[in-house]
């Protein structure tokens, strides 16, 4: 039999040796496995050649393959998160058509929920009409101050959705903080930031833990919702007076100095009227004040300190809504086509789309 001092540490067996068969090699005198030679030898789980590859670690142990989709997805938001008026019916929620957790296979929204289900249905617990009451916690009219309560609602509801905890939460809040009666009555930025922290703290401290995937969408360029319907008599006369966003919609007729100016909300042109200038100031506050809070608080205060490392801020401010993207009822909320646009842009700008051919330039 082989001398015991010649046996490698992982105990090969040969001759008359006896040992746990689960730890024994087949050949007496076989060499110690060589990690990185491309041959799966005794004691190795895998060996695809290069050390530290995508399949094997430096010890030739298999690297667990993470699912390319989350285990489930919850939604926090406002009227956009409820799909309000997506079908053109004023005030009616359309949860099935929401950009994040929508579930209607017959529409063209192709929500994040549907993309995850189509990508790996075995790993992902999809939203549907029976689960939506637990998954979609968005409430029409919600402001950032409601983030705390909606986050707690997710924590309380997640036990009802496999695997019993929230693996991903999509968040779009802030639209109703910037939409107000005037520029002066928009939510105070300091309060906005503190309310944002309150919601993040709930998600970070809850049983979701630090590994929860958060997709935090920036406030879209709401200016383009006005622009898309500004020449529509019905919208200007009958719909917009009842929409709670008068710092954008009041004086709905275009008084910009030129069509070039109206199509360039980032700059004030000589001769721009007071309504035009107010709308451009509204646009700038979203760009320069509120969205930077959403980005910087997450990255500089939480992630820089090792918290919520699987969260990501998605900036969709450059998305331009056209007439087809705005419903014809209240002339303000995204239509199903608008929800589809938001779904595509949010998904393709997120880390979940890394291998998606549909997001290729």
Features from the language model and the residues they span:
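Cysteine-rich modules of extracellular adhesion/ECM and protease-associated proteins
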Residues: 1-65
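N-terminal secretory targeting modules
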Residues: 36, 46, 59-118, 122-128, ...
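Short amphipathic alpha-helices and their capping/turn segments at secondary-structure boundaries
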Residues: 63-74, 151-164, 200-211
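Structural recognition of the beta-strand scaffold that forms the well-ordered cores
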Residues: 72-84, 133-138, 167-173, 177-179, ...
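Short, solvent-exposed loop/turn and secondary-structure capping segments
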Residues: 83-89, 147-148, 180-185, 226-230, ...
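Conserved SGNH/GDSL esterase-like catalytic core that processes O-acyl groups on lipids
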Residues: 89-195
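A structural motif corresponding to the C-terminal end of an alpha-helix
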Residues: 108-127, 198-215, 275-315
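Catalytic His-Asp segment of secreted/periplasmic serine-dependent ester chemistry enzymes
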Residues: 224-361
């Amino acid at each position: 039999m082989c001398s015991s001092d010649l046996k490698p540490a992982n105990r090969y067996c040969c001759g008359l040796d006896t040992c746990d068969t689960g730890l024994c090699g087949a050949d007496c005198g076989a060499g110690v496995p060589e990690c990185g030679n491309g041959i799966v030898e005794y004691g190795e789980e895998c060996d695809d050649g290069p050390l530290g590859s995508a399949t094997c670690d430096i010890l030739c142990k298999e690297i667990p393959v993470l699912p390319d989709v989350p285990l489930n997805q919850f939604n926090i938001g406002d009227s956009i998160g409820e799909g309000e008026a997506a079908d053109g019916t004023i005030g009616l929620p359309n949860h099935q058509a929401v950009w994040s957790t929508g579930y209607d296979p017959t529409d063209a929204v192709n929500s994040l929920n549907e993309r995850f289900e189509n990508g790996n249905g075995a790993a992902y617990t999809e939203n549907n009409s029976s689960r939506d009451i637990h998954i979609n916690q968005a409430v029409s009219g919600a402001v950032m101050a409601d983030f705390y309560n909606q986050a707690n609602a997710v924590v309380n509801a997640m036990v009802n959705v496999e695997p019993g905890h929230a693996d991903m939460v999509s968040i779009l809040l802030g639209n109703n903080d910037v939409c107000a009666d005037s520029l002066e009555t928009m939510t105070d930025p300091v309060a906005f930031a503190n309310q944002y922290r309150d919601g993040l703290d709930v998600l970070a401290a809850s049983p979701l833990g630090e590994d929860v995937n958060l997709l935090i969408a920036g406030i879209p360029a709401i200016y383009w919702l006005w622009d898309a319907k500004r020449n529509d008599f019905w919208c200007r006369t009958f719909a917009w007076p009842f929409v709670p966003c008068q710092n954008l919609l009041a004086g709905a007729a275009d008084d910009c100095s030129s069509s070039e100016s109206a199509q360039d909300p980032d700059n004030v042109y000589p001769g721009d009227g007071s309504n035009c200038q107010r709308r451009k100031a509204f646009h700038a506050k979203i760009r320069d004040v509120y969205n930077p809070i959403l980005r910087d608080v997450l990255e500089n205060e939480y992630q820089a300190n090792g918290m919520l490392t699987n969260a990501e801020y998605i900036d969709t401010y450059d998305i331009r809504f056209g007439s087809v993207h705005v419903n014809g009822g209240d002339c303000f909320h995204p239509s199903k086509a608008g929800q589809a646009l938001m779904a595509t842009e949010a998904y393709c700008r997120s880390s979940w789309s890394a291998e998606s051919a549909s997001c290729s330039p």
